[in-house]
A protein has these predicted regions:
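Conserved beta-sheet core of the metallophosphoesterase superfamily
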Residues: 1-57, 93-95, 111-113
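Long, low-complexity serine/threonine/glycine- and acidic-rich segments characteristic of extracellular
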Residues: 53-172
Length: 172
């Protein structure tokens, strides 16, 4: 079972859903009666954009993640139990990241509640958040996610605290 993010985000108030997933839709490839691939397509990004990175100590309009500043947090919105999500340091895969499903996306909540002033009903549990602490915090960090079909997605850019440029609803 998969529940995908909505193309309207949080009731058209932003370009992202309450769990941090960007507005978008699912794309399924089907051959006969079999699904041969599926992926999430953000409305404002290309299909390679599957991961958003945060640092554990960052504050987003008053909301933080419950981790130390050296923790790498990866929101991998289309992930399911068959995905493999790993942390790389200086180009070398160093460890598998741990799935945590008990927290909300502090960046999304920071925008919806902290910036827009929406109520607590704009908080959604995030069931696709991964965490890991690097061995060397000075290393060049990258998260690599490989889905059940073998598609590989990478992200090395961290979202800066209170940078909500990507969250704002586009003007059509």
């Amino acid at each position: 079972e998969h529940i995908h993010g909505a193309p309207c985000g949080v009731f058209w108030h932003s370009a992202l859903n309450g769990d941090g997933t960007p507005n978008g839709y699912a794309v399924y490839d089907v051959e006969g009666a079999a699904i041969t691939d599926w992926r999430y397509k953000s409305s404002l990004h290309d299909e390679s954009f599957q991961i958003r990175l945060h640092r554990g100590g960052d504050t987003h309009s008053g909301f933080t993640y419950p981790y130390t500043p050296k923790t790498v947090i990866a929101n991998v919105w289309n992930a399911d139990p068959e995905w493999r999500v790993t942390l790389c340091e200086n180009g070398v895969e160093t460890k598998a990241m741990t799935l945590v499903t008990t927290y909300t996306d502090a960046w999304s909540v920071g925008y919806h509640v902290g910036v827009l002033g929406r109520g607590d009903n704009y908080k959604s549990p995030c069931k696709h958040m991964y965490v890991a602490e690097p061995n060397d915090v000075r290393a060049a960090l990258k998260v690599v996610a490989v889905d059940r079909w073998g598609n590989r997605y990478e992200q090395s850019e961290f979202t800066a605290p209170d940078d909500f440029t990507d969250a704002r609803s586009p003007v059509y």
